[in-house]
Amino acid sequence: MTSESSPLLHYRLFSVSDGGLGPPDSSPIMTDAVTVGTGPTQRKLSTFFGVVVPTVLSMFSIVVFMRIGFVVGHAGLLQSLLMLFVAYVIIWLTVLSVCAISTNGAVQGGGAYFMISRTLGPEFGGSIGLMFYLANVFACGVYVLGLVEAVLDVFGRDPSDVTDSLRSLPQGYGYSFLYASIILLLCMAICLVGASIYSQASFFIFLLVFVVLLTILISFLAVRPLTVSIRHGGNVTMTGVYTGINSSTLHNNLQADYSLDYTTGNLMNFATVFAVMFNGCTGIMAGCNLSGELKQPSRSIPMGTIIAVIITFFVYLILFIFTAFTCDRTLLREDYGFFRSINIWPPFVLIGVYATSLSASMSTLIGASRILHALAKDDLFGVLLAPAKLVSKGGNPWGAVVYTWALVQLVLLAGKLNTIAGIVTVFYLIAYAAIDLACLALEWASAPNFRPTFRFFSWHTCLLGILSSLVMMFLINPAYASGSIVLLLLLLGSIHFRSSSSSWGYISQALIFHQVRKYLLLLDVRKDHVKFWRPQILLMVSNPRTSSQLIRFVNDLKKGGLYILGHVETGDLDTLPSDPVQTHYSFWLSLVDKLNVKAFVDLTLCPSVRQGTQHLLRITGLGGMKPNTVVLGFYDDACPDDYFLQDSLFTPGLSPKDDAFGVDATSLQAHFPPARDPETPRLLSAKDYVSMICDALKMHKNIVLARNFPLLVRPEASSSSPATYIDVWPLDLLRPQASAYVDVCSLFLLQMACILNMAASWRRYQLRVFLCVESRGGSDGASGWLAAEAKFRELLSKLRIRALIRVVAWDRVAAFRVQNMGGQVLNREPISSEYLNAAKSAVTDEGGTETAVRFLYLPRPPADSSLHERYLEELDTLTSGLGPTLLIHGLTPVTCTEL
């Protein structure tokens, strides 16, 4: 499976068009599962036939002939022009975004859905794509119902006029649904033949429509004033007046005068009228939806869409102005088909109405089917859209056409054009906002590969397009707008939880990178302050199979800080054909996902583990985010447990996060080597291990040694566990007289324990601090203990650390202490095993079985490397059998008592 790291394009080194220079088994180039080969192409449409013609016809639709009077009659010329301007500003802003995205790479079938999904990712793309598809479905229903309305307006039976033989078609809800179904069936038949026959039919209709528009303009100038009889059924009759070019008529038509819509009986307002008018501008995606049939979609979509928008804007503008100059309010508001009554030859307008409505219906039906087919191919909705994958031998997605036809049939049940116009407008607006959002995201991400050839846009136009679309959604119909957003969120969640990772690229990653880089540059290490210190941890991992418990525990220890998993592969790059580390990253990242830890991964290749650790200590991190604390597993002879065999997360088929970016549980099991056999020679010697501790201290890193963590019972899985304490021993148990309770290392120890106690899963545990006090045989032994406890309690209060204080009598242990000389401990002298065992017994006895994890003071390793093994043996004796234990040595001040 491809992943996000896959290249965007796969280049072939051989030509496939030069007559045989390529290899005989040349296969088509594959990009995002779309084949771009040398066989016969299905891309046949040019800019004019594939974009300009369908876009113009879709934007005109029924509105240009049947709703001009509706808009001007209710809103007046001034508000009509305002509506036109607002609508085209929104349209134009979206067109700029469409042009930018479509000229930034090859556009495949699916149009707007393809552009959104390949920019914003599958969740957002699939959600908006489905809603844009539904918008086209509803729009198709609007256009078909508009055509039925126009037919019945002329040929519908009128009981009050039995002498008119033309008006013979029965009227009523059932008959309207029947007529609409017949028209829709005709549209489906044309779309089933294919895009080629559709483009030919559209061009013929295009010519026809412009001839009709020309006759309308001529009629405005040539027809003399007349009175028009208006009938709404029954015996209701009224008259409207066509005055010709008249300034008084213009004056009367300037202001708005909203009244009842005679088709629905609802009172009109600015929002409802704008919804109907805007529906006549929403066809800008008609050419984009046919991107799979265009010869050069990246060139045709921007050029053709811009030309179509300019043409329709001026046609609407001219019609609004001439209508306001020539027709009175009654004619405009009571007869939406008044163009026919004032035309030099009335049948011309009928032809135009029927042609545009039929063309818009076909355009939205075929466009919706292409969107649905693209959605089905991407398999975002599973078996629900499986029938839409069916295609003919010629590549026509007939399954998607039939599927869409069935949904439009359901829309036709609404019965009235204006009833569903608001739904169409809201769905189109949310799709336009998504297009603008996609372009805005690309612009803000500043990705080097976003360099569209169309440059007449900016983030300002994208943002303005988003805001204007969202505002108009709620102005048109708050209920529909709210419902559409709820639907969008539901679809987002559905696709997110059921879809697997895609190879389309994630714009979120580009945006995150852009923001992280910006803030990393602002993160200045020179401004660090102890008040805002946080752990930035590098955990060195030999094999995740044996370290998973520790990886999870350190995740609780980071407290919002940096957490990096470091690993050293031993080897010499000079002897290898390629760097093996590069292929390992995906497995380590999947491990991080499986364990649900917030960690980065850093791998390196070195001849030795010690050298690799030095490299990671130096170069891991970036800017102000570099590790200040190193965690190492303890070096002992214990037989490591294979955690992968115990946790269901790593059992194939049982993990809820299986198959993340192509790495499933089986792959993880196979990638990481088995747990080390006790008889197998180790890659790291005891001497090198202690030297790594020295290296970390020399680099001014705090050091933590973790032992016995396979025995750790995690808090969330142990509600009934008796372990309820986090124990802290802030004194160097190996050399008590060489340290103090308030030195930097002791305070660091307290800070780390406090951080663990602040983690959500560890809050129910009680922090417990042990003070080792000797009576020294004096008479004031008890008072000395009390004074030591009071002094330490005051320190904890200043540090705002809540903890129990336990005073431990250290006299018995001190009796086994190594030789003292003048109060100085002789580091070269070995510490007796009796003392170490006595100290361990004291730690065990005082803590009991209720201790979950212990924090102990880690003394510095001896400077003499010959003593390193003895140093490790002392630590081994002290901590053997203690349970989960952290040995910590801190170098940096991390506590503050002031505000």
Curated annotation (Swiss-Prot):
Keywords from the named record: Cell membrane, Glycoprotein, Lysosome, Membrane, Transmembrane, Transmembrane helix, Transport
One example GO MF annotation: potassium:chloride symporter activity
Extracellular side: 66-80, 149-176, 224-266, 326-347, 415-419, 491-739
Entry-linked Pfam families: AA_permease (PF00324), SLC12 (PF03522)
Keyword NAD (UniProt): no
Record's subcellular location: Cell membrane; Lysosome membrane
The organism's place on the tree of life at top rank: Eukaryota
Cellular component annotations (GO), alphabetically ordered: lysosomal membrane; plasma membrane
Main location: membrane
Parts of the chain on the Cytoplasmic side: 1-44, 102-127, 198-202, 288-304, 369-393, 441-469, 761-899
InterPro entries: AA-permease/SLC12A_dom (IPR004841), SLC12_C (IPR018491), SLC12A_fam (IPR004842)
Membrane topology: Multi-pass membrane protein
Transcription regulation in keyword set: no
GO biological process: cell volume homeostasis; chloride ion homeostasis; chloride transmembrane transport; potassium ion homeostasis
Residue spans crossing the bilayer: 45-65, 81-101, 128-148, 177-197, 203-223, 267-287, 305-325, 348-368, 394-414, 420-440, 470-490, 740-760
Free-text function comment from the UniProt entry: Seems to correspond to a subunit of a multimeric transport system and thus, additional subunits may be required for its function. May play a role in lysosomal ion flux and osmoregulation.
Family: Belongs to the SLC12A transporter family.
Protein known as: Solute carrier family 12 member 9
Phylogenetic placement of the source organism: Eukaryota, Metazoa, Chordata, Craniata, Vertebrata
